[in-house]
Amino acid sequence: MLNFFKNLFDDNAREVKKLQRVVEEINGLEEKIAKLTDEELQGKTAEFKQLLENGKTLNDILPEAFAVCREASKRVLGMRHYDVQLIGGMVLHQGRIAEMRTGEGKTLVATLPVYLNALSGKGVHVITVNDYLATRDSEWMGKLYRFLGLSVGLIVHGIKPEDRRLAYNADITYGTNNEFGFDYLRDNMSLHPEQLVQRELNYSIVDEVDSILIDEARTPLIISGVADKPTHLYYTMAKIVPKLVREVDYTVDEKAHNVLLTEEGVSKAEKLLGIENLYDEANMEINHHLNQSLKAHGLMHRDRDYVVRDGEVVIVDEFTGRLMFGRRYSDGLHQAIEAKEGVKIEKESQTLATITFQNYFRMYNKIAGMTGTALTEEEEFRKIYGLDVVVIPTNKPTIRKDLADLVYKTEMAKFRAVVEDVVQRHETGQPVLVGTISIAKSELLSSLLKRRGVPHQVLNAKHHDKEAEIIAQAGRFKAVTIATNMAGRGTDILLGGNPEVFARAEMRKKGITEENAPAEYQQIVEKYMALCNEERAKVMEKGGLHIIGTERHESRRIDNQLRGRAGRQGDPGSSQFYIALEDDLMRLFGSDNIAGLMDRLGMEEDVPIENALITKSIETAQKRVESRNFSIRKHVLDYDDVMNQQREVIYAQRRKVLTGHNLAENIKDTITAVVERSVDMYCPEGVHEEEWDLAGLLEYAEGLYMPNHNIEPAELEEMGRQGLKDELLERTMSLYQKREEELGAETLREIERIVLLRLVDEKWMDHLDAMDQLREGIGLRAYGSKDPVIEYKFEAYEMFNNMIANIQDDVVRYIFRVNVAAPQERTQRQVVENRYAEEEGKQPIRKENQIGRNDDCPCGSGKKYKKCCGKNA
């Protein structure tokens, strides 16, 4: 094992040494580039573009382009890239992950590969975790890019489609992973080419890459429409479940995240619901609602998993502690929580389009990432995304002291010890940042500190509005800050405080901006700089920022991120974790022997222990959870890869239709496929001609591709299978030609385009639902000694082929029957975005009930109305 790590770090050192040679080349150009005037420096961009047009590669121009970017940064931003930052920039350009410690200037590092790759004109996407960071970085670094003659776009929630299109057409585009992903899905639901906003996915740099590509990898992006399902059952279950007794009527398995009824619970539930058999086929819906309500009451906790804000249940991100507005739990769980909390139940939704971040980001030609902590997840980055991790050396040595964990028997004993530590350090003036894993824990700690009279700031999902401001001042003298998890990532904690944050706050009070009054802003910054420098000296004397972790996270990476908030850029600092045996990680994954050990040692509740066995147990528990989570993500990907291949086929075909690419040929191919399939159905190969159902074939043809024909079965006898196909195809193509003459080629193309797009969208939507149901039940195949993934692939392939056949049938039927004489009324499906949904301008879906949804369709297709014309009526 030691050799493995030795080799790992040797490999890393070799990579860094290799890049050091290019750094020397860049440094050799510095003096020459510094002598250029602003105009000459700006002219370098056009010069580089010309070199690329003449056949040079990005690697050929890298040294000079980096030198130009560094010089422009000195002039525009007042910041010069360190040598280690040049190494980081090269790693990002190579399409790898640069692990850089907190405070090492990741935002500035990104300017180097962003500038270089933007010269190609194909676009660069810089992806951050929230709108605040995207806006901040696009404005801050945008000054540099604009100085060098490049355009900068910003994608944030709520901007109009035309503004999105402009932002994507810029050389460099900033935005969040959610916005980029949803724009991709929306583009693939567009009905007109001018509605498209994204262009080719060329190169992306993902900030906090571990958060986006690992922590959020299991969360699919979903655009959905409202489904027509009643909500009264959720309210019914919300009244019944509290009458069931935990551990008697049902058991809660937190590790497996499941709740199961006992035999007693089943009997009691049947009695309360007034039904004979809960598991009867007729009661499947009731059973499902009861299970979701049990999960809502037994597993989901208010102020940990979600909060209730303005009569709405809002999910809390388990990794960052931020509120996830617009995102909803699926499969009715969110509605069950709404019923439990007594708020209005929003209707369930039907998936219209979906993709995981794993598959979205794998579509880029080149992807790179930055984070402070990636090495622990290198295997996953390499296996799933093909990304290597390179650890970038720090500019100054890290001198932070990481103290040993303190382990307590109970949670309250642990919190009492944390409060004592905070009080003592606060009295000396040392700033303290306390990390908690939930809102409830942060508020408990806050109340304990209030009792002791310690002034402090709380940063959690309930108080996220001033996140950057609070976290930026966490390094001030006597500052005490409580933050859930990794809230505030992306904002540096400067010892003594951040003068620019102070200055911006004062400017806001005066009602002026930095852009409108740059001279006044600079004066205010200088005033606060003197104050902050004075405080910085006092804080340094007290040991710098101290980090307290109140619980070990299930991922070592998250713990390392918390520690990394202290000791930036060679500053002093320290960190320590306080652990209780009642903590979730220890309770669910730690060894039960530890509690017994503490009892045998006769440990008092308030006395901590430092023990190698316990430290090892914590590390083992974390590794087990990390391994389990990786397996889950890999498992999700195994299934999603099947869906992804199908998605790529559908979206590629859809894009061709949208842009009108060879549409008439596409329709002719579709007609051919439908005609040949109909002959294969009614006149199968290997069956004697006398047994062919020619009457059935003609009836089928009339309902599909030859309306009102006057062919008699006798006319088709003795033709043979190929002769039949040729005859029917010739007649159908003749009808199609007449159709084009009647309507005009341009009108028919537009009809074909709209019909194809709508049918593809509707069938794909149904297919997504069917695939979800297949995936839900496929795990049971394992009991029959079959590999569920292989079975899923096989059945998904069959379902996909059936969907394609259904699309072809319906397209042909509509084209031969559609009537454009009367003005058509268009009804737009209400679209609800599961995350960051805009509610303005939405209309409910209208339904006509003249024909029963389960009645045979009057068009004669033989299908039910709901599966045929009822969808498009």
Swiss-Prot record:
Q: Which domain of life is it from?
A: Bacteria
Name where it mostly resides. membrane
Please list the residue ranges that the record marks as compositionally biased, kind Basic and acidic residues: 835-856
Instruction: State whether it acts alone or in a complex, and with which partners, per the record.
Output: Monomer and homodimer. Part of the essential Sec protein translocation apparatus which comprises SecA, SecYEG and auxiliary proteins SecDF. Other proteins may also be involved.
Which SUPFAM superfamilies does the record associate with it? Answer: Helical scaffold and wing domains of SecA, P-loop containing nucleoside triphosphate hydrolases, Pre-protein crosslinking domain of SecA
Q: Which organism is it from?
A: Desulforamulus reducens (strain ATCC BAA-1160 / DSM 100696 / MI-1)
Tell me the lineage of the source organism.
Bacteria, Bacillati, Bacillota, Clostridia, Eubacteriales
Show the InterPro entries listed in the entry.
Helicase_ATP-bd, P-loop_NTPase, SEC_C_motif, SecA, SecA_CS, SecA_DEAD, SecA_motor_DEAD, SecA_preprotein_X-link_dom
What is the free-text note on the cofactor? May bind 1 zinc ion per subunit.
Where, by residue number, does Zn(2+) bind? Answer: C857, C859, C868, C869
Compositionally biased region (Basic residues): 863-873
Family per record = Belongs to the SecA family.
Q: Which cofactor does it need?
A: Zn(2+)
Q: Where in the cell is it found?
A: Cell membrane; Cytoplasm
Q: What is the name of the gene encoding this protein? A: secA
Protein's UniProt name: Protein translocase subunit SecA
PROSITE patterns, sorted: SECA, SECA_MOTOR_DEAD
Membrane topology of the entry: Peripheral membrane protein
Amino-acid positions noted as binding ATP in the UniProt annotation, renumbered to this chain: Q85, G103, E104, G105, K106, T107, D492
The catalytic activity, as recorded, is: ATP + H2O + cellular proteinSide 1 = ADP + phosphate + cellular proteinSide 2
Q: Which SMART domains match?
A: SecA_DEAD (SM00957), SecA_PP_bind (SM00958)
